[in-house]
């Protein structure tokens, strides 16, 4: 029992957290936004989220998946990560006009979401999460000069 407790305490906090969660259309409407009842965007969550619209046969989607898994662990206590299979959830894909994949929806707790098409490098995704979802300012570069 003591060894189990020690291992549990030594594990990073996000090992026990959910990874990327697969959403159905109904789950999306319950957790994110019910586009059938609301006209204006109003996010239902209390943490920002990232939603990957994908299909199982899409090459770029397959390359994006491990990046999203990794980032779901990195930001597990700050950002929720979801996936929506556009082949299975056609109504939802249609509602968001998803015609090419992958597309990723970045949803802040307050304000409008950002929908980006295509595969972006991990560094760009991190920058969007940091600046648009977590709202951490980008560190300022030191300026040259000073008193003479």
Predicted regions and their residues:
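Short pre-active-site segment immediately N-terminal to redox-active cysteine/selenocysteine motifs
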Residues: 46-49, 53-57, 100
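Non-catalytic, surface beta->alpha helical segment in thiol-disulfide oxidoreductase systems
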Residues: 100, 105-148
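Sec/Tat signal peptide C-region and signal peptidase I cleavage site
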Residues: 13-17
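A short beta-strand-turn-helix
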Residues: 23-47
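Short, thiol/selenol-centered motifs that function as redox-active sites or metal-ligating centers
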Residues: 55-64, 147
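Solvent-exposed loop/turn segments at secondary-structure junctions
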Residues: 55-59, 86-91, 112, 122
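Thiol-based oxidoreductase modules, predominantly thioredoxin-like and allied folds used
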Residues: 53, 64-72, 76-91
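Bacterial N-terminal signal peptides
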Residues: 2-12
């Amino acid at each position: 029992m003591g060894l189990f407790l020690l291992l549990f305490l030594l594990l990073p906090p996000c090992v026990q957290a959910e990874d990327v969660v697969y959403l159905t259309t109904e789950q999306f409407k319950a957790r994110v936004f019910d586009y059938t009842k609301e006209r204006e965007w109003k996010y239902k969550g209390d943490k920002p989220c990232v939603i990957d619209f994908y299909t199982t046969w899409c090459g770029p989607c397959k390359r994006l998946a491990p990046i999203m898994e990794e980032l779901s662990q990195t930001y597990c206590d700050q950002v929720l990560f979801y996936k929506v299979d556009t082949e299975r959830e056609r109504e939802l894909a249609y509602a968001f006009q998803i015609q090419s994949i992958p597309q990723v929806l970045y949803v802040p707790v307050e304000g409008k979401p950002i929908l980006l098409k295509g595969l972006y490098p991990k560094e760009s995704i991190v920058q969007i999460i940091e600046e648009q979802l977590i709202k951490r300012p980008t560190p300022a570069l030191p300026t040259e000069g000073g008193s003479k």
